[in-house]
Amino acid sequence: MKYKNLRDFLELLEKQGELKRITQEIDPYLEMTEIADRTLRAGGPALLFENPKGYEIPVLCNLFGTPKRVALGMGQEDVTALRDVGRLLAFLKEPEQPKSFKDLWSTLPQFKQVLNMPTKVLSKAECQQIVFSDAEVDLYKLPIMHCWKDDVAPLVTWGLTITKGPSKKRQNLGIYRQQLIGKNKLIMRWLSHRGGALDFQEWKEARPNQPFPISVALGADPATILGAVTPVPDTLSEYAFAGLLRGNKTEVVKSISNDLEIPASAEIILEGYIDPTETALEGPYGDHTGYYNEQEYFPVFTVTHLTMRKDPIYHSTYTGRPPDEPAVLGEALNEVFIPILQKQFPEIVDFYLPPEGCSYRLAVVTIKKQYAGHAKRVMMGVWSFLRQFMYTKFVIVCDDDINARDWKDVIWAITTRSDPARDCTIIENTPIDYLDFASPIAGLGSKMGIDATNKWIGETQREWGTPIKKAPNVVKRIDDIWESLNIFAPK
């Protein structure tokens, strides 16, 4: 990997024309979102706002605004190479015993990568060059973006929240949005199934009414950031996975106010605690669904220490109707999911999460069908195998002659190969995204699977249609004379 920290990565992006420095004064209130949104939709570069209105700290946006930059952040040259990352994760999830010396030799590179999994603990780090504590902490000095006009307050979006349950051996890294409500107060919005929330719940049960320690890193190196959003096995820490991606151990340092280990090269660190008795009403905010979410009470994060580099960069983003940065991340990580799914279900040919489906609410799967009812088995597998798909509402299964990434192909398969009564499977009372206001109950809704495969004996009693195919010899002859026909000659 060609970078060690965020600044190395920005230097790499700038050399490749993938970073634009904006020196003109731009307001974090709405203006940065508008510029970032237009840039992302045009496939443009990462943006470094060097002169944010009213602030001294520059703001970085659209860091992962294209699949290419996500791949670069994972140490790969292009998106297709992300399948290698998926194969590595599949191997780590279920390691296979070598069948021969040759087999052992071929897997040696994967075993060697494991040497980069342990963290390297430093005694001092750049993220603690400047320290503000207690009354000195003032979060209003950070250029926290106010993304949409009806958002209730500025929102921290790219913070890596670091937690540890009282009985767990490893830390958890998760990305949860945080509403600014005071000089040293943020609302920690995490859903109950997420790692940080589970750690907090375990803490409350083991140590009632005691403050729960938390550290939040802003501007960590891309491998660590992406490690927090990648489907790593439960037994593997995000720091360990970042070390695998980077090819070097993740450097960490102990927080000043607690025992949590934080990324040593991060730009800004927030340290503090959650009082189990303190909550606040969060939202509404414009979200990745394209709508404002409902308000709900969540824990309050009290910041006791704010540490940073001497010249920090504030890393931020916005979420809205796709495409946005989370949708781009989802599109790139789609390639990571495929080898993991294929190891469990070898019949899967392709798997696609369309960005228009909020990156996870709809999945299209193509398979090499082998028996009647096969499509339904794959549906159930998608919903149950990885926790990342527990909120996927729709799963469409097609044969391998269909391009999962071409809606024209998929719609043709649905309309010609499926019968609504026979081929639609609806499951009620399943976990659903809390932000999905279409569900009848918050957090609980239904799922639909559509079998758009050709039907086998046992699935239909009718003679099945034969697809039209062109005559190869005729296609070749017309190919040979096509240009001479001059059909599309300029007028």
Curated annotation (Swiss-Prot):
Tagged with keyword tRNA-binding: no
Localization terms from the record: Cell membrane
GO BP: ubiquinone biosynthetic process
Cofactors named for this entry: prenylated FMN; Mn(2+)
Matching SUPFAM superfamilies: FMN-binding split barrel (SSF50475), UbiD C-terminal domain-like (SSF143968)
Gene Ontology cellular-component annotations: cytosol; plasma membrane
Keyword line: Cell membrane, Decarboxylase, Flavoprotein, FMN, Lyase, Manganese, Membrane, Metal-binding, Ubiquinone biosynthesis
Cofactor note: Binds 1 prenylated FMN per subunit.
Enzyme class (EC, first level): lyase
E.C. code: 4.1.1.98
Binding site for Mn(2+): 172, 238
Active-site positions on this chain: 287 (proton donor)
UniProt main location, coarse: membrane
Reaction equation(s) it catalyzes: a 4-hydroxy-3-(all-trans-polyprenyl)benzoate + H(+) = a 2-(all-trans-polyprenyl)phenol + CO2
Positions that bind prenylated FMN: 175-177, 189-191, 194-195
GO molecular function: 3-octaprenyl-4-hydroxybenzoate carboxy-lyase activity; metal ion binding
Membrane topology qualifier: Peripheral membrane protein
InterPro entries, per the entry: UbiD, UbiD-like_C, UbiD-like_N, UbiD_bacteria, UbiD_Rift_dom
PANTHER family in the record: 3-OCTAPRENYL-4-HYDROXYBENZOATE CARBOXY-LYASE-RELATED (PTHR30108), FERULIC ACID DECARBOXYLASE 1 (PTHR30108:SF17)
Subunit (UniProt): Homohexamer.
Family statement: Belongs to the UbiD family.
Function: Catalyzes the decarboxylation of 3-octaprenyl-4-hydroxy benzoate to 2-octaprenylphenol, an intermediate step in ubiquinone biosynthesis.
HAMAP family in the cross-refs: UbiD
Name under which the protein is recorded: 3-octaprenyl-4-hydroxybenzoate carboxy-lyase
Species of origin: Histophilus somni (strain 129Pt) (Haemophilus somnus)
The gene coding this protein: ubiD
